Amino acid sequence: MNSPISLDMGAITYNMDDLYKELAIYSNSTEIPLQDSIFCSTEEGPLLTSFKTIFMPVAYSLIFLLGMMGNILVLVILERHRHTRSSTETFLFHLAVADLLLVFILPFAVAEGSVGWVLGTFLCKTVIALHKINFYCSSLLLACIAVDRYLAIVHAVHAYRRRRLLSIHITCSTIWLAGFLFALPELLFAKVVQPHNNESLPQCIFSQENEAETRAWFASRFLYHTGGFLLPMLVMAWCYVGVVHRLLQAQRRPQRQKAVRVAILVTSIFLLCWSPYHIVIFLDTLERLKAVNSSCELSGYLSVAITLCEFLGLAHCCLNPMLYTFAGVKFRSDLSRLLTKLGCAGPASLCQLFPGWRKSSLSESENATSLTTF
């Protein structure tokens, strides 16, 4: 019969604050799994280390350049037609601003992965908060686009233009305010955790060194899952199901169908990029709540999955301009005119570079009587 194992607890002393800090430095992600009762190794495998130190800097640099140029072009094109912008285009303008905010934090992510966080607490709080603000504003703006299309197509709501634009601007301002308020936990509790050995790097994380901070972390996670993802996704699904059903009933107005198609594509790309991250984060939350059996193996898998899925989500910031370019007829026309004015390219060269860009589509959009990004 196996004899029980006894430990001389007097010979082992722990500083609990140091223990919390050691356990908090789990991965390079801002979402850090913390185990209360399972002591797992924090050493990363060679593949994940190579991914963070070699692939991520190159990929994030490319995303930074594409996202910066693409979203600035979107803002310039939409700003040129500020007085004739539709409600959907106003939402897309703010969506491009949110994506630019996400683009700005990519260099910080690259630097942290290479040398750790060396930029102090203020920038640590700012960068983590901007990450959350971007996601909240993006999801809420896409939900507003879905509601706007639903009201315009299913219920044929066409309000007086000035009153409608005023309500759109108020809605966008409210979304930005909500995004800031939802990111307050990050502004209050994010901090730089210094390493306790030469193998670790300083990390910018959501501090969980006491019970109050841990509760704030759980509240932030709950808000992230529900207000930032689940509820907006349900709103989008409900609205677009109604829109598609109405368009299938009335086989008319192909221009309106194209507008809805691009809106659905933008929403779909957002969900494809961010859904894996939210699924993994939700599993991590369940593990933290001990709703699932915790193990070092599961924690290791979650650490790798969080890093990979967060990369996919961050890549989203450069995809919307590409989508507008290849799926939006009027946007292509505006982009072509802008590039021609800048001396970069004209419709003919763009059609040669992209065979799918038919000159007919460019001329068709130029003859349109109303501006539409789609």
UniProtKB/Swiss-Prot annotation:
Pfam families for the chain: 7tm_1
Name this polypeptide is given: C-X-C chemokine receptor type 5
Keyword Transmembrane tagged: yes
UniProt topology in membrane: Multi-pass membrane protein
Localization terms from the record: Cell membrane
CDD domains: 7tmA_CXCR5
Membrane topology, Cytoplasmic segments: 79-90, 148-169, 243-261, 328-374
Molecular function as annotated in GO: C-C chemokine binding; C-C chemokine receptor activity; C-X-C chemokine receptor activity
